[in-house]
């Protein structure tokens, strides 16, 4: 007896489960590597403290009342960036953001005997933008002042407030916020033109906040009919220190030192530069004229003593309309030697 084969199911066979032919790989993309550099300056304590004595000026006597030897009223602003008051500290201050004055004492040292007449006064004004005193009565009205005969030594201690202030590195700041006032020196009842004594400043100053060195070159411009405008650097020159006419230009340098001066005069014809007054030419100057511009570079030394003759003068030209200058301190070795 034969057996029947089993009937096939009418249901369609199910397809086999297959694993998708896809693989996932982790690929390391070679990114550029860098380093994070952190600067922690300055440390919590002040980075730099300096105790120094500076010669501020040589006092020249006068019959009538005169302030700062006839220089600008705000010439002696109390800020370490001021080269007239801090001739050496100004370069240290250029490396920092802030300063703090801890000690300030003015000393007058006479150079004349009792046979000389006249008086000298030293004043501290907390506002660096105030005008100079106009009478002898106003001298005693200041919070800190001292007056003496020209042959008698004296000193004035200024109270330091230990407040941090910004070092001024240009002329676009509010002077009341960055200066610790100003110093004023008044002479009267004496003889004109006689050097009576020296004024020294004993100071202790601290700096903090190291920064890239600020400009130590002053850039100035004066246009015909205008006043001297400073754009950069320390105040070797102030607006009253320069004059301009259609045929000449003059400069009075009342901060003692040796300077490198480069000037560009816009004019119709050529001229010449001379050094005189309180200054002396060092070495040889170089000059050239072309395309309505007279360009000169000189090295000279100024004694800082008041003079009615310009320290540097450009003359013999015509059509002078603008003078641009760069001036900075230098050494006598920076001069040019012809030949």
Swiss-Prot record:
Keywords: Capsid protein, RNA-binding, T=3 icosahedral capsid protein, Virion. Residues 1-46 are annotated as: R domain, interaction with RNA. Residues 1-15 have a biased composition (Basic residues). GO terms for cellular component: T=3 icosahedral viral capsid. Residues 208-339 are annotated as: P domain, projecting. Gene3D superfamilies: 2.60.120.20, 2.60.40.4030. It holds the Pfam family Viral_coat. Residues 47-207 are annotated as: S domain, virion shell. SUPFAM superfamilies: Positive stranded ssRNA viruses. GO terms for molecular function: RNA binding; structural molecule activity. It comes from the Viruses. It is found in: Virion. Residues 1-24 are annotated as: Disordered. Belongs to the icosahedral plant coat protein family. Capsid protein self-assembles to form an icosahedral capsid with a T=3 symmetry, about 31-34 nm in diameter, and consisting of 180 capsid proteins. Plays an essential role in virion formation by interacting, via its N-terminal region, with the bipartite viral RNA genome and specifically with the 3' terminus of RNA-1 and the TA element on RNA-2. Also participates in symptom development, viral RNA accumulation and systemic movement within the host. The N-terminal R domain is rich in basic residues and is essential for RNA-binding and virion assembly functions. Homomultimer. This is Capsid protein.
């Amino acid at each position: 007896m034969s057996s029947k084969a089993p009937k096939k199911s009418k249901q369609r066979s199910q397809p086999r489960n297959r694993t998708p032919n896809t693989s996932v790989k982790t690929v390391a993309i070679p990114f550029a590597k860098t380093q994070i550099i952190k600067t922690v300056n300055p440390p919590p304590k002040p980075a730099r403290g300096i105790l120094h004595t500076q010669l501020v000026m040589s006092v020249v006597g006068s019959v009538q009342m005169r302030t700062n030897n006839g220089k600008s009223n705000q010439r002696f602003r109390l800020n370490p960036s001021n080269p007239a008051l801090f001739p050496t500290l100004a370069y240290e201050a250029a490396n920092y953001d802030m300063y703090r004055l801890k000690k300030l004492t003015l000393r007058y040292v006479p150079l004349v005997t009792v046979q000389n007449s006249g008086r000298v006064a030293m004043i501290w004004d907390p506002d660096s933008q105030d005008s100079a005193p106009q009478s002898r009565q106003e001298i005693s009205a200041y919070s800190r002042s001292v007056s003496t005969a020209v042959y008698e030594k004296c000193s004035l201690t200024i109270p330091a407030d230990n407040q941090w202030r910004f070092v001024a590195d240009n002329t676009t700041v509010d002077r009341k916020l960055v200066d610790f006032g100003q110093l004023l020196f008044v002479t009267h009842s004496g003889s004109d033109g006689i050097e009576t004594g020296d004024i020294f400043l004993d100071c202790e100053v601290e700096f903090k906040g190291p920064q890239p060195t600020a400009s130590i070159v002053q850039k100035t411009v004066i246009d015909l009919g205008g006043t001297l405008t400073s754009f950069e650097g320390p105040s070797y020159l102030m607006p009253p220190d320069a004059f301009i006419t259609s045929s000449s230009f003059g400069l009075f340098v009342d901060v003692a030192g040796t300077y490198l001066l480069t000037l560009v005069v816009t004019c119709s014809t050529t001229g010449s530069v001379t050094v005189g007054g309180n200054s002396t030419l060092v070495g040889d100057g170089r000059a050239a004229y072309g395309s309505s511009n007279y360009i000169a570079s000189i090295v000279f030394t100024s004694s800082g003593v008041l003079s009615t003759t310009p320290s540097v003068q450009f003359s013999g030209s015509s059509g002078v309309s603008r003078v641009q200058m760069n001036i900075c301190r230098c050494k006598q070795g920076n001069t040019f030697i012809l030949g």
